[in-house]
Each structure stands twice: as C-alpha cells, then as structure tokens.
Amino acid sequence: VTASIAQNQNKDTSNSAPDAAIEVKNLSKIYQGQHGQPEKLALNDVSLSIPHGSFFALLGPNGAGKSTFINILAGLVIKSSGDAKIWGYDIEDQMRAARRSIGIVPQELNLDPFFTPRELMEVQAGLYGIAKNQRRTDEILDAVGLADKANSYARTLSGGMRRRLLVAKAMVHSPRILVLDEPTAGVDIELRIQLWDYVRELNRQGTTVLLTTHYLEEAEELCDKVAIINHGRVVACDETKTLLSKMDAKELNVTVAQTLNNVPDLLRGHGYNVNLIGENRLSFQYSPSKVEIGNILDLVSQAGLTVADLTTKESDLEDLFLHLTREDNAKIA
C-alpha cells in the first residue's frame, strides 16, 4: 500500500525534480516586540539546501527557530528577508505551486473532534481540489494503521493515533516533500516503529522528508543529512556520518578483575581522561586521532590489572548536538 502511494505521488515528477527540494538563502525573520518588549530575531540569515529524495533532520533546542522555519515554508509566517523555494517554486511568487509540493505534519494535535478520520481526509482532499475518483483516503489510512478507526470520531482517538492522522492528512495531495515536526511525541514505541516504516518507504520511493525531533537517536538512525540550528543560525550542516566523524571522541570502559580504590598513577597523564566507576571499572575518554586504544590497554596491563571485560562507545548525535550548541552559546555569551 505504501509503495503504491509513493509511486503515485512521484510518478509525474521523476524527470523534472530540482536538485534541491527545499532551498533557502539568507532567510531571516524578526518578530516585532509587543507591549514594550524588544523585537525577537527568530531566524538569522539562514541558508540551507535540502536535496530532493533526502531524509533530512533539522535539529535545535527549544526556541532555536525550527518552528519558525517550518511555518514560513507552510505560509503561516511571513519572512522578513531572504528567499525560499519549495521544489523550485518561490514561496511568495509561486505560492500555490509551492504549497502543492509540500505536506506538513504540525507539532500541535489540532483536529476537529466531531469529524471521523475518513471525513477529515475527505475535507482535506477537497481543499486541495482532488477529484473524488482520485482520492486515496482508505489507502492512506491503512498505511498509517488507522483503517479500523476510519469511522470513529477524532475525539476518541489516542494521542498516537491523532499524530498518525495528521501524517495521513499531510499526504492527501501526494506532496513531493513531507515535513514532520516532532511527529513521534506521545507515540508509543510500537506505533512509532510503524510510523517510521511508513515514512521510510515513502522516502525510498522518492519523497523528500524533513524531520524535526527531540529524539536524537531517531534522527541519527533515519536521516542521511543533518542541520543544527541555534539562536536562529545554522551552526552545522552536513551528512550525518561526516558530522559525527568530526567529533573525534570515544569512550573506553574497562572492567578489571581486581578491586580498586582509585585510578593507578601509571594510567594518568597520557592525553586522555580516566575515572574509576565503582570498584573495578575504568572509564577512558580519549581522542582517536591522538590516542590509540591499544596503547590504553597496554598501560592497563603494565599497571598489573587483568581485563575482565571492555566496551567502547562512539560519539553519537546527542554528543554532537550538545557540543555544537554549547560552543555556540559560549561564543554568543
């Protein structure tokens, strides 16, 4: 079902896809202050190019400007300056074509409680001018796991079901780009997996996906490219693997057979940090470009310790996110 939806969605665009599904240049947004409050610079000269067919994550702390960025694409907020294009269409000069090219799943669970999912889907399709014989309401509801709730009132749906219904509504007009703003907030693990299976299949069939999430492990697993935004500015943008490789930080945990009261002196002063955890676990934080793991293990042996177990931990997207945002905050301060 998902494959047929995605194929229908992209069948007329494969020969005319632009290099960038979303492209913004020098985009800024200033909210005017009210009641004597100072103005707020929500986006500060943001430039981003999101390749068509990519699975792209836009990450940032609360108040970083992510929602403002998405709301500008959706036409809910007017930009102060800069340019933005969706599928090659300018969001102001070619507004209708731009809107037809994008489906947005909002963060807020805003649904009419007195309509059923089927009715909400039909209304949404009507707003986009989709002929009744071209609508795929039941297909999409089945794909997001709501076929058995199609005729239930929206007010009776759980939070996770409402979230999936928002995804379904965003897909009624077969958009080339799907924007997901915190889509798995309040969704249990099983339904989260089902939702991501659906979105992954859409992406495999050519749909460009833009994701914002606070579940950084999701972004790391799903997305091939990541942009991190802080205080309205892009502080990093690259392929996920490339960004992680720049962290140059690993952790080695060595459990030894002996009981320790402190870190042996022989293990100190070699260009890494080492801490004793409990009575027999040594935790080493080191830079792979400067220190080799074999050298650490040699020193452990020279200290007369017997290795009972060891584990390593690579830097993940959460480490990168915290590192870059803290570094940026320090520059601003």
Located regions from the model:
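Conserved ABC ATPase "signature" region
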Residues: 122, 126-149
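Helix-to-loop junction immediately C-terminal to a conserved catalytic motif
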Residues: 74
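ABC transporter nucleotide-binding domain
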Residues: 196-287
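Conserved catalytic motifs of ABC-family nucleotide-binding domains
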Residues: 174
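Catalytic Walker B motif of ABC-type/P-loop ATPase nucleotide-binding domains
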Residues: 178-181
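Conserved ABC ATPase signature
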Residues: 153-157
